[in-house]
Amino acid sequence: TGAGDAEVWKCTSCDSTPTWTKVGGDGTGSAGQSWATNTYEEVASLIIVNGTTLAVGLGTSAGDAELWTCATSSCTVTTGWTKRGGDATGSGGQSWSNTIDEIRSLASSGTVIYVGTGVTAGEADVWRCDLGGTCTTTSGWTQVGGDTLNTSWASSTYERVWSLVASGTTVYAGLGDTAADAEVWKCTSCDTSPSWSKIGGDGTGISGQSWGNVSGASFLYVSSLALMGNQLFVGASSSAGTSGAELWRCDVSGTCSTTVGWTRVAGDYLNDSWGVYG
């Protein structure tokens, strides 16, 4: 990716007769136009909020972590866009500072959007704003996770919030980038009074424990999360040639902790799945 590559394209009738139109990128960044051309390298995350709003997370380089939104019915490159987050102070209701590199993950519940940031150590934070109310770069934002806030993960340790999934007022975050960083954290009452607990990572990988972080098979990051009913599925990745990419599952209606409730369902040839590569 290079500067100017961050674009959003829309496909209509994509299941039968696909037609594509560019709806974001290469604007001026002002007066309703999308973000400026020749500036942003990557659209790192996308989500539809409440069925009506397209939310786009940008970034790769320092200061590029911005959140833009547009009504799904009226997005074009030059109309309908609003910058909602980024380039602020990170305090007093303002969004994150202009040193943050990337919005790696997005999740929503109703009109509330959760934003996962980061590239470098200490940037792995989660922010919340209600798009149904006031949500601008300088108002409406609350940091809910990271920097030990609300009993969350340590400051200056984790690089990215790789993945997010929300169910009602509960949010799950997948962290990581470097050895032993692949963890899943759960936030309860995340829309009002957030409280975090670690539910995956740093286990032994056997007897119901979550994935291990032993020498030679240390998991780097939780690249993906999906929630189907009460089943939380986790995509955990390690260095090429060690454990590779694995899929794990836990029933969140029961006990899910780092050492209880987990089952590996794919990877390392398990259940006729893929092997270890690299």
What is the predicted role of each segment?
Residues 59, 118-119, 176:
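Beta-strand C-termini and the immediately following turn/loop, strongest in propeller blades
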Residues 51-56, 110-115, 169-173, 227-235:
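Entry beta-strands of beta-propeller and related beta-repeat scaffolds
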Residues 1-42, 49, 62-102, 108, ...:
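Trp- and S/T/G-rich repeat-edge/linker motifs of beta-rich repeat architectures
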